[in-house]
């Protein structure tokens, strides 16, 4: 278990030390925001359908 935690921690550290280009980070943020908006819309549609 400790080994798994250590591997996970080192992987996270390695991922955070890799400097992402600004454009890639921007694209990831846009993707994440779009994904969240789509999820919220789906939830709203489900709620409306249940209420009707």
From Swiss-Prot:
It is found in: Endoplasmic reticulum membrane; Sarcoplasmic reticulum membrane; Mitochondrion membrane; Membrane. Residues 1-31 are cytoplasmic. GO terms for cellular component: calcium ion-transporting ATPase complex; endoplasmic reticulum membrane; membrane; mitochondrial membrane; phospholamban complex; sarcoplasmic reticulum; sarcoplasmic reticulum membrane. One of its GO terms (molecular function) is ATPase inhibitor activity. Pfam families: Phospholamban. InterPro entries: PLB (IPR005984). The modification N-acetylmethionine is found at residue 1. The modification Phosphothreonine is found at residue 17. It is a single-pass membrane protein. CDD domains: Phospholamban (cd20250). GO terms for biological process: acrosome assembly; adenylate cyclase-activating adrenergic receptor signaling pathway involved in heart process; cardiac muscle tissue development; circadian sleep/wake cycle, sleep; intracellular calcium ion homeostasis; locomotor rhythm; muscle cell cellular homeostasis; negative regulation of ATP-dependent activity. Its main location: endoplasmic reticulum. Heart. Keywords: Acetylation, Endoplasmic reticulum, Lipoprotein, Membrane, Mitochondrion, Palmitate, Phosphoprotein, Sarcoplasmic reticulum, Transmembrane, Transmembrane helix. The chain crosses the membrane at residues 32-52. The modification Phosphoserine is found at residue 16. A lipid is attached at residue 36 (S-palmitoyl cysteine). Phosphorylation by DMPK may stimulate sarcoplasmic reticulum calcium uptake in cardiomyocytes. Phosphorylation by PKA abolishes the inhibition of ATP2A2-mediated calcium uptake. Phosphorylated at Thr-17 by CaMK2, and in response to beta-adrenergic stimulation. Palmitoylated by ZDHHC16, promoting formation of the homopentamer. Gene3D superfamilies: Phospholamban. Homopentamer. Can also form heterooligomers with other sarcoplasmic/endoplasmic reticulum calcium ATPase (SERCA) regulators ARLN, ERLN, SLN and STRIT1/DWORF. Monomer. Interacts with HAX1. Interacts as a monomer with ATP2A2; the interaction decreases ATP2A2 Ca(2+) affinity. Interacts with VMP1; VMP1 competes with PLN and SLN to prevent them from forming an inhibitory complex with ATP2A2. Interacts with S100A1 in a Ca(2+)-dependent manner. Belongs to the phospholamban family. Reversibly inhibits the activity of ATP2A2/SERCA2 in cardiac sarcoplasmic reticulum by decreasing the apparent affinity of the ATPase for Ca(2+). Binds preferentially to the ATP-bound E1 conformational form of ATP2A2 which predominates at low Ca(2+) concentrations during the diastolic phase of the cardiac cycle. Inhibits ATP2A2 Ca(2+) affinity by disrupting its allosteric activation by ATP. Modulates the contractility of the heart muscle in response to physiological stimuli via its effects on ATP2A2. This is Phospholamban. It comes from Canis lupus familiaris (Dog). The gene is PLN.
């Amino acid at each position: 278990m400790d080994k798994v935690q250590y591997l996970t921690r080192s992987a996270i550290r390695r991922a955070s030390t890799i400097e992402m280009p600004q454009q890639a980070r921007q694209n990831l943020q846009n993707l994440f925001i779009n994904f969240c908006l789509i999820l919220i819309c789906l939830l709203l549609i489900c709620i409306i359908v249940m209420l009707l």
